[in-house]
Design a protein with these regions (language model features):
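Mature extracytoplasmic or organellar-lumen-exposed domains after removal of signal/transit peptides
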Residues: 9-291
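C-terminal motif of bacterial Sec signal peptides marking the signal peptidase cleavage site
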Residues: 4-7
Length: 291
């Protein structure tokens, strides 16, 4: 599985100081009226992010299909790799998928989140099947992966209907960073494989995807704050890369000082991104519909 770690928010360079404007960063933006260049950049941001999510959801469907095929062949090692790849792809659109809680829980629910009378399924059920016993429980994994294979195209279809506005894209990035700190860094997700570095790396990359999509618009609206967001995100990705290969570094190998530094960097990046997202309110809020 390849987890891309790319330069965050470097899609455009800040314009000259002569183009600077006064922008409110408290609650909502007062940047009005918008310019034709900004409106064009807003349309591009929505289209770019929609394509990014579409690519991730398509890859998720493919990874789940590979998982089913490798389980049918009895190849546990390959199936484990497929499960981690699918988990990383889900992390790319986790926050957007959260708009449909039933679909999201069907795909990525933890055992402790299963309600009375409900059955445990999805990615973490397959993870349990593959890692909780030596050599994996292929029969159980096949059953759980079959349900996941049926649900994956549903998730892809639901996501295809979303085209978040620039402000909403920024908020999704903030949510990614908050989830990274509150859920991934705490090592609460991968309870059987103990490879939470997969979630850490993929979620940081998801935040980067959001920041990169709105970067050209950000640099037109508030170049100074846009540069701060880019710098913070680049520093976060460097911290994540320093942890090592996500699929090879177990939770026991992740040092507390490293995780604390990463959490602080993610918190700082989230704060800056939240401020910048508020400046994008004039370009629309919310999500459904064509860009």
């Amino acid at each position: 599985m390849a987890l891309a770690v790319c330069a965050c928010g470097t899609a455009a360079s800040p314009p000259g100081h002569g183009d600077a404007r006064t922008v409110s960063r408290v609650g909502s933006a007062t940047h009005d009226p918008t310019t034709p260049a900004e409106r064009a950049a807003a349309v591009t941001a929505r289209s770019t992010f929609r394509d990014d999510i579409g690519n991730a959801s398509s890859a998720f469907v493919a990874d789940v299909a590979h998982l089913q095929g490798d389980l049918q062949a009895g190849d546990v090692a390959a199936a484990r790799s497929d499960e981690l790849a699918a988990q990383a792809q889900f992390d790319q659109f986790r926050q957007l998928a959260g708009g449909d809680p039933i679909n999201a829980s069907t795909v990525d629910e933890l055992a402790t989140q299963v309600g009375p009378g409900q059955s445990f399924g999805g990615l973490h059920a397959v993870e349990r099947d593959l890692w909780s016993v030596p050599g994996g429980d292929v029969g159980a994994a096949l059953s759980d992966a079959s349900g996941l294979e049926a649900q994956a195209p549903v998730a892809e279809f639901l996501l295809s209907k979303d085209a978040p506005a620039p402000e909403a894209i920024g908020v999704l990035g903030v949510d990614d960073l908050n989830w990274l700190v509150d859920q991934a860094v705490t090592e609460d997700q991968e309870r059987y494989s103990h490879l939470d570095a997969v979630d850490i790396a993929a979620t940081a990359d998801a935040a980067d995807t959001a920041v990169s999509a709105i970067a050209p618009l950000d640099h037109l609206v508030d170049p100074t704050l846009a540069a701060e967001v880019a710098e913070g995100c680049t520093a976060l990705l460097a911290d994540v890369a320093a942890l090592g290969p996500p699929t090879q570094v177990t939770d026991g190998q992740l040092g507390a000082p490293q995780l604390l530094a990463l959490s602080r960097q993610a918190d700082a990046a989230a704060a800056d991104l939240a401020r910048l997202s508020a400046d994008l309110v004039p370009f629309g809020t919310g999500g459904d519909g064509d860009p």
